[in-house]
Structures are given as structure tokens and as C-alpha cells.
């Protein structure tokens, strides 16, 4: 069963807030902006992560210099799963943050 519009927005809002909290607490040198439902994380070296919601598809999208990734929410696991690779959002973020900032962050709760 597809996510309702309200549930989808609640999930994306909660995910973006959790990401903001995690990055705030990380001590990394970065800037964040959350505007109109789009969360942008800018790393010291200029790399960016952009998280946006795609309401018609009920997907969370992540843009990174390595590409664009589309995530569906899996109700059974309570996790966002990449549409193509089936990698969890948290796993992908751990790898990307390591590559961009040289730091290991724990995204298990994302």
C-alpha cells in the first residue's frame, strides 16, 4: 500500500530533522539550510548533499556530486531504501560523508 500524502510528509520531515540534528552534533565544518522542504548540507570543501521530497512519487531524493538517488520508504524496516541499488539511506550517507569529509558518522537511525 502506498504512503498517504500526510504520512509521507511526516516521514520526510522527521528524516530531515534527524539529519539536521545528526550533522549539528557531528562537529563537522558544514553549513545547512532547510527551505521549502529542501535540506542542503554544504561541506567545507564545497561538496553538497541536497535532500528533497518528490510528493507525486512519495520518494525522498538525494543529490550528490556522484549522482541522484531516489529512496522509497519501507514500512516493514522503517528505512528509506534506494530504488535502484536497494542500499539504505543511512548506509549511503555513511559512505558519502566519509568520502566528502573524512569522518565516520552513524546514520543507523536514519
From Swiss-Prot:
GO terms for biological process: iron-sulfur cluster assembly. The lineage of its organism: Bacteria, Pseudomonadati, Pseudomonadota, Gammaproteobacteria, Pseudomonadales. SUPFAM superfamilies: Frataxin/Nqo15-like. This is Iron-sulfur cluster assembly protein CyaY. Involved in iron-sulfur (Fe-S) cluster assembly. May act as a regulator of Fe-S biogenesis. One of its GO terms (cellular component) is cytosol. It comes from Pseudomonas putida (strain ATCC 47054 / DSM 6125 / CFBP 8728 / NCIMB 11950 / KT2440). It comes from the Bacteria. NCBIfam families: FeS_CyaY. GO terms for molecular function: ferric iron binding; ferrous iron binding. Pfam families: Frataxin_Cyay. Keywords: Iron, Metal-binding. Gene3D superfamilies: Frataxin/CyaY. Belongs to the frataxin family.
Amino acid at each position: 500500500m502506498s504512503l498517504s500524502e500526510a504520512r509521507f510528509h511526516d516521514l520526510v520531515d522527521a528524516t530531515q530533522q534527524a539529519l539536521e540534528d545528526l550533522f549539528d552534533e557531528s562537529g563537522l565544518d558544514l553549513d545547512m539550510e532547510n527551505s521549502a522542504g529542501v535540506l542542503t548540507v554544504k561541506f567545507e570543501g564545497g561538496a553538497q548533499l541536497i535532500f528533497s521530497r518528490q510528493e507525486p512519487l512519495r520518494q525522498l531524493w538525494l543529490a550528490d556530486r556522484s549522482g541522484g538517488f531516489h529512496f522509497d520508504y519501507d514500512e516493514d524496516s522503517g528505512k528509506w531504501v534506494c530504488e535502484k541499488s536497494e542500499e539504505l539511506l543511512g548506509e549511503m550517507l555513511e559512505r558519502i560523508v566519509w568520502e566528502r569529509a573524512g569522518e565516520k558518522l552513524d546514520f543507523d537511525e536514519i
